[in-house]
């Protein structure tokens, strides 16, 4: 099989910024409390009329420009999201149509905050096996639309945005070197939006009970996240024949600083190698890792030949990690 790598990245966040001081006027909280417990100072919020497909489209345009690839050349579009425009059609279809990706196959993928990692792992297999040549993977969310803005335990955490990556064949020995993906359905109720599916279809009752908003058992999710982030990163590195000492850049899911700091400590990696932007964006679920990836690539934190690890966890419960030898040289 051929080597597959990321040859272009892009990201987009809405213009509207919601600061901790704004939240002080909405719920019983304050800036010091939020920063000390999460590290978040502000987050970007989409306008009510803006769907996630708009954010995904903007990120995709930037990624395609970075990869110097025309939309017509795309063979596959995958969108990872828990906030699609509609139950169906897939947001990937809407984004591909707007881009003009006329010959591409496409579908949505749902693995919550781990979604982008599941997306790139899936897309890479299509390219590695010779089925497709060019794939676009997008992680996008408008989480502000599924938040209970009266619940200070969740509404302070999340933001809106999208990140995208273009995958192609790259030179041998570069690109994706190893993956680790996993799930534990027994923990599904710890992080969920119970309303709107076939279990609890939308009704006046589900709306009144705020079942169409994110519900989270914070302390249990925290304990799971701290443990699994280190474990899955090390497993992916082992599959790549590498160790933590080989890593030049770590891009974790941007949940909160306490989780990131604890995972970094467990891994024993230099904090200077870790990309953190959650102070400006909050937790953007499937968009967190690709937005951080794009910022790292464009700021010069990722250089040719660097070993980079993306690692995350999310509802499901799900988790995953991908090890990449960085190369922007598409073949």
Curated annotation (Swiss-Prot):
GO CC term, one of those recorded: cytoplasm
Main enzyme class: transferase
Subcellular compartments: Cytoplasm
Domain of life assignment: Bacteria
Swiss-Prot/TrEMBL keywords: Acyltransferase, Cytoplasm, Fatty acid biosynthesis, Fatty acid metabolism, Lipid biosynthesis, Lipid metabolism, Multifunctional enzyme, Transferase
Keyword Chloroplast found: no
Stretch list, region ACP-binding: 254-258
Pathway(s) per entry: Lipid metabolism; fatty acid biosynthesis
Gene Ontology terms: biological process: fatty acid biosynthetic process; secondary metabolite biosynthetic process
CDD domains: KAS_III
Active site residues according to the UniProt entry: 113, 253, 283
NCBIfam families for this protein: fabH, PRK09352.1
Summary of the function given for this chain in its UniProt record: Catalyzes the condensation reaction of fatty acid synthesis by the addition to an acyl acceptor of two carbons from malonyl-ACP. Catalyzes the first condensation reaction which initiates fatty acid synthesis and may therefore play a role in governing the total rate of fatty acid production. Possesses both acetoacetyl-ACP synthase and acetyl transacylase activities. Its substrate specificity determines the biosynthesis of branched-chain and/or straight-chain of fatty acids.
Domain notes: The last Arg residue of the ACP-binding site is essential for the weak association between ACP/AcpP and FabH.
Subunit (UniProt): Homodimer.
UniProt similarity note: Belongs to the thiolase-like superfamily. FabH family.
HAMAP family, sorted: FabH (MF_01815)
Protein name as catalogued: Beta-ketoacyl-[acyl-carrier-protein] synthase III
Provenance organism: Desulfitobacterium hafniense (strain Y51)
């Amino acid at each position: 099989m051929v080597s597959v790598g990321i040859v272009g990245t892009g990201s987009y966040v809405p213009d509207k910024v919601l600061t901790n001081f704004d939240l002080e006027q909405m719920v019983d909280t304050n800036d010091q409390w939020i920063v000390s417990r999460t590290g978040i100072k502000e987050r970007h919020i989409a306008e009510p009329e803006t769907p996630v497909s708009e954010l995904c489209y903007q990120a995709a345009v930037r990624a395609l420009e970075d990869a110097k690839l025309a939309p017509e050349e795309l063979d596959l579009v995958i969108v990872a999201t828990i906030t699609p425009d509609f139950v169906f059609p897939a947001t990937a279809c809407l984004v591909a149509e707007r881009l003009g990706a006329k010959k591409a196959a496409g579908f949505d993928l749902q693995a919550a905050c781990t979604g982008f990692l599941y997306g790139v792992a899936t897309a890479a297999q299509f390219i590695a096996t010779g089925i497709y040549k060019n794939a676009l993977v997008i992680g996008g969310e408008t989480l502000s639309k599924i938040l209970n803005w009266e619940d200070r335990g969740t509404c302070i955490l999340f933001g809106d945005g999208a990140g995208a990556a273009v995958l192609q064949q790259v030179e041998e020995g570069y690109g994706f070197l190893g993956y680790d993906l996993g799930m534990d359905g027994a923990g599904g109720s710890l992080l969920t939006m119970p309303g709107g599916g076939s279990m609890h279809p939308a009704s006046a009752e589900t709306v009144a009970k705020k079942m169409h908003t994110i519900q989270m058992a914070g302390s249990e999710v925290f304990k799971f996240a701290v443990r699994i982030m280190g474990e899955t990163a090390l497993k992916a590195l082992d599959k790549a024949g590498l160790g933590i000492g080989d890593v030049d850049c770590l891009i974790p899911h941007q949940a909160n600083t306490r989780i990131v700091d604890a995972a970094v400590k467990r891994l024993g990696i230099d904090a200077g190698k870790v990309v953190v932007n959650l102070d400006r964006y909050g937790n953007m679920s499937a968009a967190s890792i690709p937005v951080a990836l794009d910022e790292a690539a464009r700021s010069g934190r990722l250089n040719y030949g660097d070993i980079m690890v993306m690692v995350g966890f999310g509802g499901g419960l799900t988790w995953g990690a991908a090890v990449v030898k960085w190369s922007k040289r598409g073949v």
